Swiss-Prot record:
Pathway: Protein modification; peptidyl-diphthamide biosynthesis
Main location: cytoplasm
Location(s) in or outside the cell: Cytoplasm; Nucleus
Binding site for Fe cation: 25, 27, 47, 50
A GO cellular component entry from the record: nucleus
Entry note about domains: The DPH-type metal-binding (MB) domain can also bind zinc. However, iron is the physiological binding partner as zinc binding impairs the protein electron donor function.
Family: Belongs to the DPH3 family.
Pfam family, one: Zn_ribbon_CSL
Cofactor(s) in the UniProt record: Fe(2+)
Name recorded for this polypeptide: Diphthamide biosynthesis protein 3
Catalytic reactions on record: [3Fe-4S](1+)-[protein] + Fe(2+)-[Dph3] = [3Fe-4S](0)-[protein] + Fe(3+)-[Dph3]; 2 [3Fe-4S](0)-[protein] + 2 Fe(2+)-[Dph3] + NADH = 2 [4Fe-4S](1+)-[protein] + 2 [Dph3] + NAD(+) + H(+)
Keyword Cell wall biogenesis/degradation: no
Species lineage: Eukaryota, Fungi, Dikarya, Ascomycota, Saccharomycotina
DPH-type MB domain location: 3-59
Length: 69
């Protein structure tokens, strides 16, 4: 699997209402990944508008900051 980029979780934006993290995609949309998917070990965020994917770099303890939001 090839990734457009590898992004640190700290650089992503958390939407507490939807429970997702986003990051701007070059196509103009946003890469998205659900917090629950990250908890399950998923690390690939996809863009719904194009075929690009990014790898989210994080440690499991990094997720705790979003649960407190």
């Amino acid at each position: 699997m090839s990734f457009y980029d590898e992004i640190e979780i700290e650089d992503m934006i958390f939407d507490a209402d939807q429970g997702i993290l986003t990051y701007p995609c070059p196509c103009g949309d946003k890469f998205q990944i659900a917090l629950d998917d990250l908890k399950d070990g998923e690390e690939v965020a996809v863009c719904p508008s194009c075929s690009l994917m990014i790898k989210v770099i994080f440690d499991p303890e990094d997720l705790e900051q979003f649960e407190e939001s």
